[in-house]
């Protein structure tokens, strides 16, 4: 019998009691409480992955080492798992347990980018040979189903997935941590940094914005026909921008990227560098967190994005923290032409009243195409 939403600690401890761990994955707000619990109570057992396919591969390695890993992912990233699930886990018979959130669940309101994947999530898992069922919200029933999942994985050597609907896991209340001492002047908020970027760049610049709150803040404060708001498809904005730039050689192009998004598709920087003569200003807003899914940490704190861009062949790289340096870097990049990276260190957090996009995604794309054609 249902008892309401599961407590995150209850879910984590049930998984651990059944021998599961380590945990790895990419955040979704539906499973944010689970990640918060792992980070607070079992940090050595949680590995932040850059994308869902990497998480499955990490889990496969854990299986080879004798563990029973759990992969955490949003169903919008399920496509990233297709190759490692079908050609690694299935082929080598390496069973991993998946917790897949159910955004876009049919009959439930959600954002347009989740509609198709929400409709096909169960069928997609089934077609990949991944037995799946909806996560029970009753602890006793969940314990029974974990036994079933373990039996299936042990017998077949194949993965098993629990699909996690919205609200299935209750918020996790962690003990308040002491605030970290400030290191230097306060960083800009993302909306402030976006404002400095837009005001510094050529007004005719074609600007592609990554998914989540970056695109939403750009639309709210600086909407114009030359903006494209990429919803979903996390990590793809820089490649979209390069595709635009390669095919509009007479236009200036820029992309507002994020640290989590850049890490998810880090290979895009190699392709941009290979085409470093193409006019593309890559603006990487780095707050060291997945802000749009609840502020879970990314792995960006230890990543030298400027060094990577330089090694990939970008014409110049900048690592900035203040408004003056940011504006100067944008102006310099657009004056010099070619591919340039500007990493912008920003503070975490955003406006709690930030609304959803006003412009439907197809309308945004159509308007952007018209702006290019003019």
What positions do the PLM features span?
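A contiguous pocket-lining binding segment that forms or flanks enzyme active sites
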Residues: 279-313, 319
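Residue-level marker for buried hydrophobic side chains located in beta-strands
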Residues: 207, 253-256, 283
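A short, acidic, amphipathic alpha-helical segment used as a generic capping/interface helix at domain edges
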Residues: 147, 322-335
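DG-centered beta-turn motif at the end of beta-strands
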Residues: 76, 251-269
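A short alpha/beta connector and helix-capping loop motif
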Residues: 86, 96, 265-286
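Thiamine diphosphate
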Residues: 1-241, 246-251, 320, 355-374
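Active-site flanking residues adjacent to catalytic metal/cofactor-binding acidic residues
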Residues: 164, 256-259, 285, 344
């Amino acid at each position: 019998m249902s008892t309401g939403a599961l407590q995150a600690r209850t879910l984590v401890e049930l998984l651990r009691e059944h021998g599961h761990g380590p945990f790895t994955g990419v955040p979704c707000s539906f499973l944010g409480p689970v990640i918060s619990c792992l980070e607070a109570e079992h940090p050595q057992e949680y590995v932040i992955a850059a994308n869902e396919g990497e998480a499955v591969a990490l889990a496969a390695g854990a299986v080879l080492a004798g563990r029973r890993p759990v992969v955490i992912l949003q169903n919008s990233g399920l496509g990233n798992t297709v190759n490692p699930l079908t050609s690694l886990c299935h082929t080598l018979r390496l069973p991993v347990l998946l917790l897949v959130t159910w955004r876009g669940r049919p009959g439930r309101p959600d954002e347009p980018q989740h509609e198709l994947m929400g409709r096909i999530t169960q069928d997609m898992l089934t077609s990949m040979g991944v037995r799946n069922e909806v996560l029970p919200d009753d602890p006793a029933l969940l314990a029974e189903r974990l036994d079933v999942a373990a039996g299936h994985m042990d017998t077949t050597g194949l993965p098993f997935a629990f699909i996690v609907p919205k609200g299935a896991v209750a918020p996790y209340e962690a003990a308040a941590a002491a605030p970290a001492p400030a290191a230097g002047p306060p960083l800009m908020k993302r909306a402030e940094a976006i404002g400095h970027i837009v005001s510094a760049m050529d007004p005719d610049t074609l600007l592609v914005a990554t998914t989540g709150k970056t695109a939403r803040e750009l639309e709210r404060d600086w909407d114009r026909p030359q903006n494209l708001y990429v919803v979903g498809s996390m990590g793809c904005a820089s490649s979209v921008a390069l595709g635009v730039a390669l095919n509009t050689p007479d236009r200036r192009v820029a992309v507002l990227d994020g640290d989590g998004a850049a890490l998810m598709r880090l290979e895009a920087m190699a392709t941009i560098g290979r085409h470093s003569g193409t006019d593309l200003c890559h603006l990487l807003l780095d707050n060291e967190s997945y802000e749009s899914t609840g502020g879970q940490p990314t792995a960006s704190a230890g990543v030298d994005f400027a060094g990577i861009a330089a090694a990939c062949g970008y014409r110049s790289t900048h690592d900035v923290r203040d408004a003056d340096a940011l504006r100067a870097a944008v102006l310099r990049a657009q004056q010099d032409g070619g591919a340039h990276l500007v990493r912008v260190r920003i503070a975490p957090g955003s406006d709690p009243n930030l609304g959803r996009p006003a412009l439907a995604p197809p309308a945004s794309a159509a308007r952007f195409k018209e702006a290019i054609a003019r």
